[in-house]
Regions:
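Short, surface-exposed helix/turn micro-motifs that flank interaction/cofactor sites
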Residues: 39, 66, 73, 158, ...
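C-terminal regulatory/effector modules of DNA-binding transcriptional regulators
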Residues: 1-2, 57, 186-240
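Alpha-helix N-cap/helix-start motif at coil-to-helix transitions, marked by capping-box chemistry
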Residues: 25-28, 63, 97-104, 120-127, ...
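Short linear motifs at protein or domain termini
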Residues: 1-116, 121, 225, 229-240
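Alpha-helix N-cap/N′ positions at the starts of helices
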Residues: 83, 106, 128, 193-196
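Conserved amphipathic alpha-helical segments that form helical-bundle/coiled-coil interaction surfaces
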Residues: 120-183, 195-204, 212-222
Length: 240
């Protein structure tokens, strides 16, 4: 089992800029940072999370840490053993397929509605994210930024049908799928494929073709799932 990832002095947590300008509750900050590191595989499956160590690292009491861990449990990203330890879960292929089903069903409906009556400002914003992604294609030093822009692109689509909260809900429920995508995105040619798929989705939406929008989005969201057997074979230690 992987040792506690917070047990050494050089493994520190950075403080990201707070989003939205408002004050973020302490438990939400702890949850968000831990979740981001788990999704990025900086905290890998089987890693042990010790509440007292986390409280020290975040300079908080154990109460917000407990709340954050509870949310991570609800996301299926950790398992807590009473009076013992909290362990990061391995990626579960069955859960990946469930999460893919959920995300595909919802996001295909989003693009269909956008094609029928899209918000021009939201679509303009989505196009802007694609231009930024274009500058990063095949730059493996910028994979993390490319991934952030990918998430921003999809969030813009949800905002275009006035469903930004639904996008956050989908993100929270798709942690296993997100970790699979973390493994897949650095693959040769993958970022170029993602960008091309995003462009195809936008072209279909802007053409007002709901059926084509759905087909292109479904194809786009299924790429990592199709590659999952190969990814599992290459990273057996990360999967259950």
């Amino acid at each position: 089992m992987t040792k506690n990832p917070f047990s050494t002095a050089d493994n520190t947590l950075s403080e990201p800029a707070l989003r939205g300008g408002g004050r973020v509750p302490t438990s939400s900050r702890v949850y968000r940072e831990l979740r981001e590191r788990i999704i990025a595989l900086d905290i890998p499956p089987d890693a042990i999370l010790v509440r007292s160590d986390l409280a020290e690292r975040f300079d908080v009491s154990q109460s917000p840490v407990r709340e954050a861990i509870l949310r991570l449990e609800q996301d299926g990203l950790v398992i807590s053993y009473p009076q013992s330890r909290t362990v990061v879960t391995r990626i579960d292929p069955a859960r990946v397929r469930e999460e893919h089903f959920l995300r595909t069903a919802v996001e295909c409906e989003v693009v269909r509605r956008l094609a029928e009556a899209g918000d021009p400002e939201a679509l303009k914003k989505a196009r802007g994210f694609l231009k930024m992604q274009e500058a990063l294609v095949d730059d493996m030093d910028q994979v993390d930024l490319f991934k952030q822009l990918d998430e921003a692109f999809h969030e813009a689509l949800f905002s275009g049908v006035n469903q930004p909260n639904l996008h956050r809900h989908i993100q929270a429920r798709c942690g296993h799928l997100a970790r699979l995508r973390t493994l897949d995105l650095p693959s040769p040619g993958k970022t170029a494929q993602v960008l091309a798929a995003h462009r195809s989705v936008m072209d279909a939406i802007e053409a007002g073709d709901g059926d084509l929008s759905v087909r292109t989005m479904r194809e786009h969201l299924s790429g990592s799932l199709r590659r999952m057997p190969q990814i599992v074979e290459e990273h057996l230690e990360l999967f259950c």
